[in-house]
């Protein structure tokens, strides 16, 4: 299934992050907590400004981002994969290689 977000919405797939405890034990899954990093899968056309113009989004498909995993971020299952739908304003940073 193909999904196309509207306006300033962004579709992100959460990246799993491996964590280690203070004792060096590798934590995975729920013990490691949810990652707030992900890869952008799709972006909307942009935010509609008060004057009616459309401002393109700063993020693009393929960007790795750090996001705020709170109110307003919606999890959905698409083709048996969980993706997150959020506004661009929920994205805090783009991770540059």
Swiss-Prot record:
A biological process term (GO) from this entry: chaperone cofactor-dependent protein refolding
Keywords recorded for this protein, A-Z: Chaperone, Cytoplasm
InterPro entries the record matches: Chaperonin_GroES, Chaperonin_GroES_sf, Chaprnonin_Cpn10_CS, GroES-like_sf
Compartment annotation: Cytoplasm
Major subcellular site: cytoplasm
GO terms of molecular function: ATP binding; metal ion binding; protein folding chaperone; protein-folding chaperone binding; unfolded protein binding
GO cellular component terms attached to this protein's record: cytoplasm
NCBIfam families noted in UniProt: PRK00364.1-1, PRK00364.1-2, PRK00364.2-2
Entry similarity comment: Belongs to the GroES chaperonin family.
Record's function text: Together with the chaperonin GroEL, plays an essential role in assisting protein folding. The GroEL-GroES system forms a nano-cage that allows encapsulation of the non-native substrate proteins and provides a physical environment optimized to promote and accelerate protein folding. GroES binds to the apical surface of the GroEL ring, thereby capping the opening of the GroEL channel.
PANTHER family: 10 KDA HEAT SHOCK PROTEIN (PTHR10772), CO-CHAPERONIN GROES (PTHR10772:SF58)
Complexes and interactors: Heptamer of 7 subunits arranged in a ring. Interacts with the chaperonin GroEL.
Protein name per Swiss-Prot or TrEMBL: Co-chaperonin GroES
Organism (species): Yersinia pestis
Highest classification ranks of the organism: Bacteria, Pseudomonadati, Pseudomonadota, Gammaproteobacteria, Enterobacterales
Gene this protein is translated from: groES
